[in-house]
Amino acid sequence: MVHFVGAGPGAPDLITRRGAALLQEADCIIYAGSLVNPALLGLAKPECAVYNSAEMTLEQVLDVMRRVEAAGGTTVRLHTGDPCLYGAIREQMDALDADGIPYDDTPGVSSFCGAAAALNAEYTLPTISQTVIITRMEGRTPVPEKEKLASLAAHGATMVIFLSVGLIDKVQQALLAGGAYTPETPAAVVYKASWPEQKVVRCTVGTLAGSTRTNGITKTALIVVGEFLGTRYERSKLYDPTFTTEFRKGADQ
């Protein structure tokens, strides 16, 4: 059995209880060493075999899973954040399907949630934004033409940009090219959300590249953009005294 487990954004206590239990029971752990907090490996039993997938190819990862399965053991494939976002799990699951090896998925707290917590922010504010776009800048891995950053930026929605801080100048240019964001639109860069070395840089779209460079951030950071970082919004209807819900009547009813 293979368990795909989300490690959370960084802090060891942000892994789910199920994820922690699976780590404690695993015969083998293959973890994304470039991003997963190694403190989580302290949950492993002494005889557990541990592999750092940052040093491995897909084929090598699969070979380890097959060997453990053949021996009757269980493997935890430990991914950063939530595996469903930029986790490259589909190719692993397809290979396991082909081999007849059972697997399941345990979700984790994504780093985009960790970034919101670091900012003490809400991505979806009434009258400001009810949409969150999660994307990345094109680099060595291409993105579909219809998903170019400038095209997505045209919506002016809350945007969370993964895997792109090393291309910060291109990110800034694309955000402005979309037409909905202005140089004054609030933005932030969150480095290693929830880790002890977490750093939050608040800026605007116009100062995004310069602020990122000034703070020496070149990797392991999320870029967030949108008016949700500003001060304007309207009160939620859900808790308005005049609003009727299934559970209470509004004051004017």
Q: Which functions belong to the PLM regions below?
A:
Residues L43-A44, D63-V64, A116-N120, R136-M137, ...:
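Short secondary-structure transition/capping segments
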